[in-house]
């Protein structure tokens, strides 16, 4: 691709920085934009009732004529989960590897978007041309198969985006990471490297996925007489393959529970990414037909999600599986930051039921540690370092690695979502401006209709409850005709607080009298006076601040 010394490449992260999840980055050159990944994140503890969080793509909507397509690095939720929501407004083609497209197809089917969305399967080593860009897919290793790094060729220079990766010389399925190709591109001259920062604080190398297979073999050998239940990420197909291998080796049938687990395993097996021996896989309803020591159950719930299968088993509300004393339960994952309490709660519930819970040594990370990050930098030799994928401390740790490897401080950019980094070979790179970004909250079928005000109301209700005041006023004079009747929910138990309720009614009546004395007849003002008077009274009596909702009827 011919270089243009005057034009500038604009790199615009719209999510995924200073947080875990919601990865999405736009690359813009003149009249062309490509979007790398389009992921979701899961709600914080204080986002009551929220199911998912997706990125605000206002910038893409404002420049929709420039957007040429979504280029996806791999099939994890934090990289593909927002696609069904964003595609409704920005319907452009999707380019990804075979398994990634298969997992995206599952999502598009759920949202009735399969027929209207163009998908193209790209092989590792292949390139695609989108507007001013050429994008090459490079084989990497991760905790899901078919993961890719991207070499993005633009008139301003080459940018390498690693996606999520690790260096695994002995992967369970397929080839090792294509380090040779990284080196070859590095010799051409790389303008910038955008590298996975998740494990940038961890020294050494990430262990191979195959080591987990040996751990499973040891656990299966030591627990020959018990039922084994294993919780892991649904998308970790290599992990599932090793569980199946150990189950087959020790003569156990395998059942799968959890909607996402069933979907991913079905897709991976159909596309040839899972090798399941004949008659090994059974339906969850069939496990009762086999002795406990002949069954392995692979389930969702490794992160303590309240509605996941393992959590429902722990709470005795699963319809098909009841935890038994001496069950062996393996957590084949590490808690994502923020999920530690939920995971601990599930482990405690399972332990109370007599299960033997194993949550150590049955997991390896899918992300590169410091020595692997250094290796990629050494092969690529970028002019600029742009750490991505992680909280601020992770990005900062990678920035230090880049400094240690000789990249000047002024050539290292720790970006925030919305920053517009402009760069080319000739002029110093700089953050030029900031575009609108943010989080769009998904609650049931509602996308974006729950904002900060609604969340604040939900938090208020959760903390102090609500008090509803119902009264009837004479239309013209605003004289009290009936009530006030007070209904309380989540504040106090009315039957045990009758004196408080009686006093509250008197406070409301006094507030109405004040309005009459001052000739206040505007109902909005009357409601505010009731709220202020009653709120002050309740705070003095209880040191609580319930939401107060006056309802006025006229007669």
Label each residue range with its predicted role.
Residues 519-555:
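C-terminal tails and terminal domains of large nucleic-acid-associated
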Residues 17, 41-45, 49, 66-67, ...:
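A glycine- and charged-residue-rich anion-binding loop/surface
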Residues 93, 386, 549:
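Short glycine-rich phosphate-binding loop at a beta-alpha junction
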Residues 2-71, 76-289, 308-322, 341-344:
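His/Asp/Glu-rich metal-coordinating catalytic cores
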Residues 11-13, 119-121, 192-194, 329, ...:
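Conserved beta-strand scaffold positions in the cores of enzyme catalytic domains, especially
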Residues 202-332, 336-503, 507-519, 527:
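Hard-cation-handling environments
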Residues 108, 402, 538:
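Conserved hydrophobic residues forming the short capping helix/wall of the S-adenosyl-L-methionine
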Residues 132, 147-149, 294, 466-468, ...:
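Broad gene-expression machinery/nucleic-acid interaction feature
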């Amino acid at each position: 691709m011919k270089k243009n010394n005057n034009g500038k490449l604009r790199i615009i992260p719209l999510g995924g920085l200073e947080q875990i999840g919601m990865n999405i980055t736009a690359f813009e050159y003149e009249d062309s934009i490509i979007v790398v990944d389009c992921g979701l994140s899961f709600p914080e503890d204080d986002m009551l009732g929220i199911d998912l969080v997706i990125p605000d793509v206002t910038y893409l909507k404002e420049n929709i004529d420039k957007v040429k397509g979504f280029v996806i690095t791999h099939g994890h939720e934090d990289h593909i989960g927002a696609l069904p929501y964003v595609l409704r407004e920005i319907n452009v083609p999707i380019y990804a590897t075979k398994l990634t497209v298969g997992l995206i197809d599952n999502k598009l089917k759920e949202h009735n978007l399969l027929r209207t969305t163009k998908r193209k399967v790209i092989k590792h080593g292949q390139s695609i041309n989108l507007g001013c860009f050429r994008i090459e897919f490079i084989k990497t290793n991760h905790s899901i198969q078919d993961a890719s790094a991207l070499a993005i060729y633009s008139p301003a220079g080459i940018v390498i985006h690693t996606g999520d990766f690790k260096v695994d010389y002995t992967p369970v399925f397929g080839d090792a990471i294509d380090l040779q190709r990284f080196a070859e591109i590095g010799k051409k001259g790389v303008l910038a490297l955008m590298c996975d920062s998740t494990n940038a604080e961890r020294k050494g190398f990430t262990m191979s996925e195959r080591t987990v297979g040996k751990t499973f073999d040891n656990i299966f050998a030591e627990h020959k007489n018990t039922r084994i239940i294993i919780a892991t990420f649904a998308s970790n197909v290599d992990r599932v393959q090793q569980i199946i291998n150990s189950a087959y080796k020790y003569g156990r049938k395998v059942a799968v529970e959890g909607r996402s687990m069933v979907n991913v395993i079905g897709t991976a097996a159909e596309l040839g990414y899972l090798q399941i021996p004949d008659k090994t896989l059974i339906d969850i309803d069939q496990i009762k037909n086999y002795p406990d020591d002949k069954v392995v159950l692979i389930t969702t719930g490794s992160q303590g999600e309240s509605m996941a299968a393992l959590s429902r088993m722990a709470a005795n509300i699963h319809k098909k599986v009841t935890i038994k004393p001496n069950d062996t339960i393996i957590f084949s994952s590490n808690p994502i930051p923020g999920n530690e309490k939920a995971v601990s709660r599930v482990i405690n519930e399972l332990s109370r039921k007599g299960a033997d819970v194993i949550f150590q040594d049955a997991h390896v990370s899918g992300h590169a540690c410091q020595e692997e990050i250094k290796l990629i930098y050494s092969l690529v030799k970028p002019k600029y370092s742009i750490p991505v994928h992680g909280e601020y401390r992770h990005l900062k740790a990678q920035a230090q690695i880049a400094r240690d490897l000789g990249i000047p401080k002024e050539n290292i950019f720790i970006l925030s979502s919305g920053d517009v980094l402009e760069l080319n070979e000739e002029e110093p790179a700089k953050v030029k401006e900031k575009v609108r970004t943010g989080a769009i909250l998904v609650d049931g079928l509602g996308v974006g209709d729950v904002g900060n005000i609604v969340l604040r109301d939900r938090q208020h209700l959760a903390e102090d409850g609500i008090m509803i005041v119902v009264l009837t006023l004479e239309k013209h004079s605003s004289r009290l005709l009936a009530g006030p009747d007070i209904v309380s929910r989540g504040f106090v138990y009315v039957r045990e607080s009758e004196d408080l309720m009686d006093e509250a009614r008197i406070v409301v009546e006094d507030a109405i009298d004040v309005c009459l004395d001052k000739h206040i007849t505007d109902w909005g003002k009357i409601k505010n006076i009731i709220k202020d008077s009653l709120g002050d009274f309740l705070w003095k009596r209880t040191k609580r601040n319930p939401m107060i909702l006056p309802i006025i009827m006229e007669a």
